[in-house]
Amino acid sequence: MTDLPDSTRWQLWIVAFGFFMQSLDTTIVNTAIPSMAQSLGESPLHMHMVIVSYVLTVAVMLPASGWLADKVGVRNIFFTAIVLFTLGSLFCALSGTLNELLLARALQGVGGAMMVPVGRLTVMKIVPREQYMAAMTFVTLPGQVGPLLGPALGGLLVEYASWHWIFLINIPVGIIGAIATLMLMPNYTMQTRRFDLSGFLLLAVGMAVLTLALDGSKGTGLSPLAIAGLVAVGVVALVLYLLHARNNNRALFSLKLFRTRTFSLGLAGSFAGRIGSGMLPFMTPVFLQIGLGFSPFHAGLMMIPMVLGSMGMKRIVVQVVNRFGYRRVLVATTLGLSLVTLLFMTTALLGWYYVLPFVLFLQGMVNSTRFSSMNTLTLKDLPDNLASSGNSLLSMIMQLSMSIGVTIAGLLLGLFGSQHVSVDSGTTQTVFMYTWLSMAFIIALPAFIFARVPNDTHQNVAISRRKRSAQ
């Protein structure tokens, strides 16, 4: 990339900036959950909605982001994304109640949903095709650093300042990024087809109300009748989308995608798999602080080995899949993650704290292998004309399943514990033990889906070829 003009390199730095902001925010909040609960006068069992409100909003808004960038221009949308994300951060810091915080997190989610996909689109437009992979590697590297710094930085800020600062640090960064975007980024636009607004609204309503219904009376305080009404509305919305998309070439996501068996299996496995693994980033720091009495900073540091294991495994995952095939790798890593989850719970409750970093490192390795395998399996056999739509649907399902996973984790804590779980409670560790056992069971379930994947290792050569072209 050394032969790129200075203006293009600056534009890549802006995109990398956005990737870093978004990825940092996905992990920095987790460590602060117990402190937020204490400050806002809420039970920690209700605080999972702080994560769900953000991730669910990202899932809902993702399908519209690419179309908006093509229609309005990448500079305008990227600038808007940074401004919304920064304003959301400010409102989060100013929140005095849980409901105010949830609304502010949703505003953050709107900005976050546009930031990453529009950033990818920007790179595609400003960089020659032969340098696209190198440019994407450059701009996504800060996105890999964000999850590494997030837990420790969040714990440090909570312990030595207050939880408000995990949001306030976004404000100067966002202001600089917004100004740089206006000054340095060109406003590329493209001719767009008509946006499937009807399909978008049906999917958005279906995803949102079903997630709220799942949270139920424990989190939202809804009556059984209201929950039943939400379920009915959500199911009807999704059924209407299926009818809307049938034989509709302009549908948001074509049903032709599901004619590819590996896509159908991969998407189902990704949805179920990320429900289980989506619980872990929320539950681990909460358990370390409330269940074991760790300080916020110490709990944040404990998350770093998991991220390091994930980053390290990415270097060899291609060879592993090529050697053993998708079916064996996905079944083994799914069951392995369930066992590692049980191992983490056991070592923690036995007080073997010096073993926990190694267990978390192993958890990161297994999880990374499974994620990479699921993503590639889902997309590898799609025809070129459906690849972009399939990738967008996968991205949306990833966010949706993670929000559902965090919701279920909160429900499990509420099911096994009282409304006032705290470090001083004598039953707290028992509550967490039953929750971790249930999580391990849920994490293992997708193995039944992955067992149906054709064990055709010859097709895995496609991953290796893509990997080499990226280097």
From Swiss-Prot:
Record topology, Periplasmic segments: 1-12, 70-76, 125-137, 186-196, 246-262, 307-341, 417-430
Originating species: Shigella flexneri serotype 5b (strain 8401)
Cytoplasmic side: 34-48, 98-101, 159-164, 218-224, 284-285, 363-395, 452-471
Key words, A-Z: Cell inner membrane, Cell membrane, Membrane, Transmembrane, Transmembrane helix, Transport
GO cellular component annotations of the record: plasma membrane
Subcellular location: Cell inner membrane
InterPro entries: EmrB-like, MFS, MFS_dom, MFS_trans_sf, Multi-R_MdtD
Record-stated family: Belongs to the major facilitator superfamily. TCR/Tet family.
Name of the protein described by the UniProt record: Putative multidrug resistance protein MdtD
